[in-house]
Amino acid sequence: MEEIQRYLQPDRSQQHNFLYPLIFQEYIYALAHDHGLNRNRSILLENPGYNNKLSFLIVKRLITRMYQQNHFLISTNDSNKNSFLGCNKSLYSQMISEGFAFIVEIPFSLRLISSLSSFEGKKIFKSYNLRSIHSTFPFLEDNFSHLNYVLDILIPYPVHLEILVQTLRYWVKDASSLHLLRFFLHEFWNLNSLITSKKPGYSFSKKNQRFFFFLYNSYVYECESTFVFLRNQSSHLRSTSFGALLERIYFYGKIERLVEVFAKDFQVTLWLFKDPFMHYVRYQGKSILASKGTFLLMNKWKFYLVNFWQCHCSLCFHTGRIHINQLSNHSRDFMGYLSSVRLNPSMVRSQMLENSFLINNAIKKFDTLVPIIPLIGSLAKANFCTVLGHPISKPVWSDLSDSDIIDRFGRICRNLFHYYSGSSKKKTLYRIKYILRLSCARTLARKHKSTVRTFLKRSGSELLEEFLTSEEQVLSLTFPRASSSLWGVYRSRIWYLDIFCINDLANYQ
């Protein structure tokens, strides 16, 4: 019991004091503003997430007014005209919340750096690579092939915002910072939108999105503390996919690893080729828990998690938010992809003395596909095509120059190819490329008041060559030696570590 309690309690040694004085420093707001650039970058606009209202003059004025304590008094008589920070309440509150979010992230950033430096002989990894959305998919490729059932969990929101404040008390002992946090939650937040919203991923305020996402993630982090203990108890060594045993290139590496483990401890070898007990991933207000075993075991997991979250995390949780699905017969919308696990047949020839025989093996493979129907629906919603996928012109962009129109369409096409580079089948991407290319041609023809054929004859087909060379340029830079066999590269899945948000057209949910 003591060991379980130790895992459930956060690391108290990582608590940090005196965070509140940082809110009066000018560089905090500059760092917070720069850190938030392009966090909501769209493929349709240049810099929609850029807030051009920030200036050092406003920051100085804000800090000066914060030193005057009477500006923190809340007027209960008039809720529309609050005395907080004068007339620019919305702008100042947004700036303070962004700065405060940057400040409270400092203890977590220090803890992340210290944990990453403990691996590979105190070598610090590039932590920003871990933020990439694509970094999750290779992790799933190596693990999901072992598992049978999956729990689809819709993560609930806390029943009261005071619970969010209580989760941070383990990390921040500065009472002033916690009081300021309560002030923001009760003064600038609609409680009903947080608790009763039907779309948990979009229930946050757009202006203070980073601030409230941080609070929510820290809260879910405490709810997930039990998985650390269960994972450590389920396996002692990092498992390797059994599909690699069929490849001769990995055989000698397995032998060397076996000898290494035999020399240390014989009992540990029992865990070497043992499949993982469970696998947990959280994304977009949802989470999936995959595990070995039968349907009965997953049903026990379901009721265990519900009871644990209700008692330990004060969650209003019910079993209807968890669904059990068989992994091989179920596909899900996973971060813009249509993900599933399919059986990949493999035949191995084995020879024993003078006799040889063939062995058929069906290996589970994590498959990622482009959801063509929802993606065409997103293109139709953005007025690039009809609901049936027929390209149409974009009248809103017809007032722009030809180069700007081509650049916008080309940027959308490049971003979609970049995001869906990990797709198992890329043929659907070329259909999207055809829609965007013809929509661009129709938009240019509409601007010049002519037909598409007449415009292309007059301007030349090289005007749209950007659509032809976009993915070739990316692949030639990524794989300089694969230019002769570029078709083989197209068929392979490529995961990038520079994708920090889902594009508008990819986020079709």
Swiss-Prot record:
Q: Which InterPro entries match?
A: Domain_X (IPR024937), Maturase_MatK (IPR002866), Maturase_MatK_N (IPR024942)
Q: Which keywords annotate this record? A: Chloroplast, mRNA processing, Plastid, RNA-binding, tRNA processing
Q: GO cellular component terms?
A: chloroplast
Q: What GO MF terms are annotated?
A: RNA binding
Gene Ontology BP terms: mRNA processing; RNA splicing; tRNA processing
Where in the cell? Plastid, Chloroplast
* Keyword hit for RNA-binding: yes
- Keyword GTP-binding on this protein? no
Q: What does this protein do?
A: Usually encoded in the trnK tRNA gene intron. Probably assists in splicing its own and other chloroplast group II introns.
- Family of the protein in this entry: Belongs to the intron maturase 2 family. MatK subfamily.
Q: What is this protein called?
A: Maturase K
Origin organism is Nicotiana tabacum (Common tobacco)
Q: What is the lineage of its organism?
A: Eukaryota, Viridiplantae, Streptophyta, Embryophyta, Tracheophyta
